[in-house]
Amino acid sequence: RREARLAAIAEAKAKIEARAEERDATEQAAYQEKVARREAQRKAGKKPRGRDPEPPTGGPRDKDQINFTDPQSRIMPVTGKGFDQCYNAQAAVDTESLLVTHVHVTQATNDKQQVMPLLTAWQGYPETLGKPDHLLGDTGYFSASNIQACHDHGIEPLLAMKRDVHHLPVFERFAADPPAPESEDPVEQMAHRLKTQAGRALYALRKHTVEPVFGIIKHVMGFRQFSLRGLDKVSGEWRLATMAWNIKRMHRLTAG
């Protein structure tokens, strides 16, 4: 029994180190992106806002853990509940039909790495399904690389650059559009777009689209948590849940 426990501990340690390497690579890429963006702003004669980013610290951390019940799950923040063992379920929803157009499940604790899988999936869809022209996402999806990736795929991104303000002051709500930036930087162009009347109206569709779908799946259809273990099985559960929503929604659409 002692040998088995030591072997399990050694295996857990190896997994923690492997996860730390993946996290280090992601954090280093994000750091380099921020540094490059600030340097580009300086070269353009603009002063970057805030302090320069601190380089990430590599290696395993004191709070890194392995779950022996479901090793593929990850500790993630849960709204109003602190932290729990979770998977990150993603879904893209069409703003007109409210049909789910793409789903996947990831072990990543944030959403910044989830834009490219979506764009890649959309690119492989049959032409008869049409092509999205905008991608609306909250601040969790914002990064300069995601904005550029959307443009590379012929899609205009509207990704919140800070937490949503639910009730804008009346003056801001009806203010004239600000002048367009002289810079062709995609991030600055998108920031301007989000400040225009048309851009705000378009982005506002997000809270009437994906949030109700998640809410109905949870509170009406009763799918509040995964019952199986492992990424593949959990992914299958999520596909079934969203498929059930699509069938429910298509029945509603065809019934008039």
Model-assigned labels for residue ranges:
Residues R1-G256:
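Anion-binding and metal-coordination hotspots
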